[in-house]
């Protein structure tokens, strides 16, 4: 907190931590708005492979503009510091929401699923496959809007990229992928 990035973004607080990155709430003083900043962890910032994957996430998501997808505003490399500036969603992950409520009714579940499907369809229309769909990567805003986040292992799909590699979180990949069979991305 209190740290500035690019003399523009003031870090306010840590929102969450993932395997490769930490996400902070920040204030953009140029546009006078709150944003989320996803920072690649230090232990990965010198690894060209991780830096490349991190940039690919930003590039995959940056071209997507849809009410059910978290918007990417900027991607920045400052020496060994790599970060993505994104839309800040005031809310909680679908995983936290489910744990908090304990049970979701059919109507609510369908409403959430429709919003997720609309976001994924918009990504697919741009030939982007998310490849890591799980409750932790869905954010529900305070007003009930569901947004797909974390395109970290997304892939631009063409006939050359369709393969048999299993990619995703082990608890959420399809049985076909787990067996090493055909996968569309």
Go through the PLM ranges and name each one.
Residues 79-93, 97:
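Conserved short submotifs of the Hanks-type protein kinase catalytic core
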Residues 75:
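Activation-segment/catalytic-loop signature of the eukaryotic protein kinase fold
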Residues 41-63:
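AlphaC helix of the eukaryotic protein kinase fold
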Residues 118-128:
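Protein kinase catalytic-loop region centered on the HRD/HxD motif
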Residues 27-34:
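Conserved N-lobe loop of protein kinases adjacent to the ATP-binding glycine-rich P-loop
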Residues 12-18, 23:
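Protein kinase glycine-rich loop
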Residues 112-113:
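Activation segment signature within eukaryotic-like protein kinase domains
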């Amino acid at each position: 907190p209190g740290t500035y990035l690019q003399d523009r973004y003031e870090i306010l607080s840590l929102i969450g931590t993932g395997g490769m990155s930490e996400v902070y709430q920040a204030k953009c003083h140029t546009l006078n708005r709150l944003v989320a900043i996803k920072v690649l962890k230090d232990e990965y910032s010198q690894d060209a492979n991780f830096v490349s994957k991190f940039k690919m996430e930003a590039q995959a998501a940056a071209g997507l503009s849809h009410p059910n997808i978290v918007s990417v505003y900027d991607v920045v490399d400052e020496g060994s510091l790599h970060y993505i500036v994104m839309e800040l969603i005031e809310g909680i992950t679908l995983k936290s929401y489910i744990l908090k409520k304990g049970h979701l009714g059919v109507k609510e579940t369908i409403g959430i699923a429709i919003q997720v499907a609309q976001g994924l369809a918009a990504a697919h229309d741009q030939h982007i496959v998310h490849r890591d769909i799980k409750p932790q990567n869905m954010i529900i805003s305070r007003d009930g809007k569901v947004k797909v986040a974390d395109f970290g292992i997304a892939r631009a799909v063409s006939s050359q990229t369709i393969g048999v590699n299993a990619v995703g979180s082990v608890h959420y990949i399809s049985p076909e992928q787990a067996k090493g069979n055909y996968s569309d991305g």
